[in-house]
Each structure stands twice: as C-alpha cells, then as structure tokens.
Amino acid sequence: MSVDISTVKRVAHLARIAVSEDDAERMTGELNAILGFVEQLNEVDVEGIEPMTSVTPMKMRMREDKVTDGGIAAAVVANAPVTEDNFFVVPKVVE
C-alpha cells in the first residue's frame, strides 16, 4: 500500500489539520516509509507464538471479583448540601 499526496491532503482535511503543499509532499514520503515498515511486519512468521501483553513474561495480578459498596459512600456525599440515602439530591430541571 502506498500513500499519494491527495490521500495526505484528504486525511489532513478529515483531521481538520492545515497542511501546506511542501508539508504534504514531505508527509507523503514519511507515511510511505512507515507503511513500508508495517508491510515488513506482515512478513514475519508468528505461527504458534502466543500473544503477549508485555515484552517480559509476567502474570497479571488479579483481585477477587466481588461486589462491594466501596465503604466510602458517606464520605463522598459529605459535602453535598442535600442527600438522601447516600445519593445526591438535585433540583428538578425538566418537567
């Protein structure tokens, strides 16, 4: 896949970025170089290799999945002018 100057201008327009003609030409070359590197990555044989979440093998530390109220509901609503059963009470704004 390669990028031409019209594609660079179109992407810049979609991203709402002002790009001069000189910058568009320069970016065309840079984007083509990046895409060339990505195409090289597609050639690597990864058959039988497990996906990794990190470059170093490590176990994810997981906590027990249990439902709690957090124990801080009263502290959260402590500064609110009006509360009811640990919920904020606000004036009705829509009829």
UniProtKB/Swiss-Prot annotation:
Catalytic activity: L-glutamyl-tRNA(Gln) + L-glutamine + ATP + H2O = L-glutaminyl-tRNA(Gln) + L-glutamate + ADP + phosphate + H(+); L-aspartyl-tRNA(Asn) + L-glutamine + ATP + H2O = L-asparaginyl-tRNA(Asn) + L-glutamate + ADP + phosphate + 2 H(+)
Keyword set includes Protein transport: no
InterPro entries for the chain: Asp/Glu-ADT_sf_sub_c, GatC
Gene Ontology MF terms in the entry: asparaginyl-tRNA synthase (glutamine-hydrolyzing) activity; ATP binding; glutaminyl-tRNA synthase (glutamine-hydrolyzing) activity
Keywords: ATP-binding, Ligase, Nucleotide-binding, Protein biosynthesis
EC number: 6.3.5.-
SUPFAM superfamilies per the UniProt record, alphabetical: Glu-tRNAGln amidotransferase C subunit
UniProt xrefs under Pfam families: GatC (PF02686)
Gene Ontology biological process terms, A to Z: glutaminyl-tRNAGln biosynthesis via transamidation; regulation of translational fidelity; translation
Subunit record text: Heterotrimer of A, B and C subunits.
Protein task: Allows the formation of correctly charged Asn-tRNA(Asn) or Gln-tRNA(Gln) through the transamidation of misacylated Asp-tRNA(Asn) or Glu-tRNA(Gln) in organisms which lack either or both of asparaginyl-tRNA or glutaminyl-tRNA synthetases. The reaction takes place in the presence of glutamine and ATP through an activated phospho-Asp-tRNA(Asn) or phospho-Glu-tRNA(Gln).
PANTHER family: GLUTAMYL-TRNA(GLN) AMIDOTRANSFERASE SUBUNIT C, MITOCHONDRIAL (PTHR15004:SF0)
Family note: Belongs to the GatC family.
HAMAP family: GatC
Name of protein: Aspartyl/glutamyl-tRNA(Asn/Gln) amidotransferase subunit C
Organism of this sequence: Brucella canis (strain ATCC 23365 / NCTC 10854 / RM-666)
Name of the gene: gatC
